[in-house]
Design a protein with these regions (language model features):
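Radical SAM enzyme [4Fe-4S]-AdoMet core and its adjacent flexible, acidic
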Residues: 127, 136-254
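Canonical Radical SAM [4Fe-4S] cluster-binding loop centered on the CxxxCxxC motif
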Residues: 6-49, 61, 283
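Alpha-helix N-cap/loop-to-helix initiation residues
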Residues: 75, 102, 170-173, 199-200, ...
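Radical SAM/AdoMet-radical enzyme domain recognition
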Residues: 51-68, 76-175, 182, 192
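Secreted/processed peptides and extracellular or luminal domains of membrane proteins
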Residues: 32, 36-39, 207-214, 262-265, ...
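Flexible mid-to-C-terminal extensions adjoining Fe-S/redox cofactors in radical SAM and related proteins
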Residues: 251-315
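Short, Lys/Arg-enriched N-terminal segments with co-localized hydrophobic residues
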Residues: 1-3
Length: 315
């Protein structure tokens, strides 16, 4: 649905995706990572329980897009099998990645059908990378930046759709963000700047300064109905477009109405993960209780499910 607001084009779409937390492992230790809410999970593999769960989401909530998350999804040995199985069941499959897997692994995943990759690249400056990691020497930082660049260009050359996500926590990150921006602009790759939820307005203001530095003008917005997800798109003087993630004030009433936490993400979406052999739906990163972390079978009988179903099955 396309509307116009003060000459800015606004495209509104209904949420149609769910995030699968396929592993909690990651070789990086970024100081702003929220780990999708938990580290105490098991790797997801394609079995009858997961298949039935995914198809139940598809049938009841029109979910047709799966986004792998983690941890670092490529750390999971099951990722290729998951990709093939989900595609064969009619799903569009995307993954987030730090871009550090071996190139042979990346090529294999492409052969499995993976065509949409969001690279989490927060700087291409080795010194800047050291600053956002808990422990890293300069030699390792140089090696990581080189691998990331090569893998991004490799998978793009193979034909996959590539997007870069870059977190800007404060004004101290602006120069590092510009190193990524220049790389994506030079190679015709999409980039989206993300605010650090834990830094609040400090991070938001830093991105505003970055946009000014890039001499860019807002041209359009994409809003997801049933989620706090929103992206504002800007165009610089060379007509290169980039995105800025924004959080719209959307809260799930069955989860957020009585919550005392000053949540920065609001309700972003559903996350599916496995713990102690059981599948759970996670609805919040800020806390874990019976309203926000629900056994799969109980979820489909819950008030949260009813509210989400109404939102995601709107005509």
């Amino acid at each position: 649905m396309l509307v116009m607001e003060n000459t800015i084009r606004v495209n509104k779409r209904i949420s149609n995706s769910i995030r699968l937390k396929v592993t909690s492992r990651c070789e990086l230790h970024c100081n702003f990572c929220h780990k999708e809410g938990s580290t105490s999970i098991e790797d997801l593999c394609w079995d009858r329980n997961l298949r039935e769960a995914i198809l139940a989401f598809k049938q009841s909530m029109n979910i047709d897009e799966i986004h792998f998350t983690g941890g670092e999804p490529t750390e999971s040995k099951y990722l290729g099998e998951l990709t093939q199985a989900l595609i064969s069941n009619g799903f569009k499959v995307k993954t987030t990645t730090n871009g550090l897997c071996e190139k042979e692994r990346l090529i294999a995943l492409y052969s499995n059908g993976l065509r949409y990759l969001n690279f989490s690249i927060h700087t291409l400056d080795p010194v800047g990378l050291q600053r956002i990691q808990k422990r890293m020497n300069i030699a390792d930082a140089l090696k990581i930046v080189d691998i990331q660049k090569k893998n991004i260009l490799l998978i793009k050359k193979l034909g996959a759709a590539v997007k870069i996500n870059t977190v800007v926590s404060s004004i101290d990150d602006i120069e590092s963000a510009c190193t990524v921006y220049n790389f994506t602009k030079d190679h015709g790759i999409s980039i989206r700047f993300l605010n650090n939820l834990s830094k609040g307005i400090k991070s938001v203001n830093a991105i505003k300064i970055l946009v000014q530095k890039l001499h860019a003008q807002k041209t359009r917005e994409e809003v997801t109905i049933g989620s706090s997800s929103k992206t504002a798109f800007y165009t610089d003087r060379d007509h290169y477009e980039f995105g800025v993630k924004e959080i719209q004030d959307f809260k799930l009433q069955t989860v957020c109405a009585t919550c005392a936490i000053d949540c920065k993400e609001h309700f972003y979406g559903m996350r599916l993960e496995k713990r102690n052999g059981e599948l759970f739906v996670r609805l919040c990163l800020a806390k874990e209780d019976k309203k926000t972390f629900i056994n799969l079978k109980a979820f489909f009988l819950s008030e949260q499910f009813k509210e989400l179903k109404e939102l995601t099955t709107l005509n």
